[in-house]
Curated annotation (Swiss-Prot):
It comes from Photobacterium profundum (strain SS9). It is an enzyme of class 3 (hydrolase). Keywords: Amino-acid biosynthesis, Hydrolase, Methionine biosynthesis. The active site is at E12, D198. GO terms for cellular component: cytosol. This is 5'-methylthioadenosine/S-adenosylhomocysteine nucleosidase. SUPFAM superfamilies: Purine and uridine phosphorylases. Catalyzes the irreversible cleavage of the glycosidic bond in both 5'-methylthioadenosine (MTA) and S-adenosylhomocysteine (SAH/AdoHcy) to adenine and the corresponding thioribose, 5'-methylthioribose and S-ribosylhomocysteine, respectively. Also cleaves 5'-deoxyadenosine, a toxic by-product of radical S-adenosylmethionine (SAM) enzymes, into 5-deoxyribose and adenine. It catalyses: S-adenosyl-L-homocysteine + H2O = S-(5-deoxy-D-ribos-5-yl)-L-homocysteine + adenine; S-methyl-5'-thioadenosine + H2O = 5-(methylsulfanyl)-D-ribose + adenine; 5'-deoxyadenosine + H2O = 5-deoxy-D-ribose + adenine. One of its GO terms (biological process) is nucleoside catabolic process. InterPro entries: MTA_SAH_Nsdase, Nucleoside_phosphorylase_d, Nucleoside_phosphorylase_sf.
Length: 232
């Protein structure tokens, strides 16, 4: 089984990259791909860049050039669920855009034209994430809706808009729905497993800078364990 792992930023992929054996580096379309072996599995680790377009371009290249059997999206996210604290993990059951609006043409808020309203995570990968979680002491996770947009959510107005339109949202970030849409179009299963680096409020930028390393550590540990389980 070949597994694709996607993180937007260098800090979000470094821990996993350092665990790869027989690592080779490839540069395509402005993205960095690391191929190698992780916990016995063939892995392609993508550093896509930040935002929806960068993520979609990188994911499309990953899927076309390397043809993974599944995609795991790792990294950081802003917490919306009240039970989440810094370093906790979020596991996607579905992913939606929070900044898409073609409702004038009869689509749901957040639904891109000619696309499903939500991109549904693969149930086997969700169960694998929960199995990985069960093997780790003192790690808390919430599964649910993750919303994506090309904005760092740090104002009460933006937070209220997202809560009003997506009341079940547990976390927000800037790449997952674009990754999910690419996987949907290539018919490749995906799941998002990220860790909380900040809470979506006015203190978010300061929190993000301080706690990104903690989020990267938590999400990387989860993903590495998932790879081990998937390879069994």
């Amino acid at each position: 089984m070949k597994i694709g792992i996607i993180g937007a930023m260098e800090q979000e992929v470094t821990i996993l990259k350092e665990q790869l054996t027989d690592c080779e580096t490839h540069h395509k379309a402005g993205c960095i791909f690391y191929t190698g072996n992780l916990n016995g599995a063939d892995v392609v680790l993508l550093q896509s860049g930040i935002g929806k377009v960068a993520a979609a371009v990188g994911t499309a290249v990953l899927l076309e050039a390397f043809q993974p059997d599944a995609v795991l999206n790792t990294g950081s996210a802003g917490g919306f669920d009240s039970s989440l604290t810094l370093g906790d993990v979020v596991i996607s059951t579905e992913v939606r855009y929070h900044d898409a609006d073609v409702t004038a043409f009869g689509y749901e808020i957040g639904q891109m034209a000619q696309q499903p309203a939500a991109f549904i995570s693969d149930e086997k990968l969700i169960l694998t994430a929960e199995q990985a979680l069960a093997s780790m002491a003192d790690m808390h996770a919430v599964r649910g809706l993750i919303c994506t947009g090309d904005a760092f959510v740090c104002t009460p107005e933006k937070q209220a808009f997202i809560r009003d339109n997506f009341p079940t949202v547990i976390a927000v970030e800037m790449e997952a729905a674009a990754i999910a849409q690419a996987c949907h179009q290539f018919n490749v299963p995906f799941v998002v497993v990220r860790a909380i680096s900040d809470v979506a409020d006015k203190e978010s930028p300061m929190s993000f800078e301080e706690f990104l390393p903690l989020a990267a550590q938590s999400s990387s540990v989860m993903v590495a364990k998932m790879v081990e389980i998937l390879n069994q």
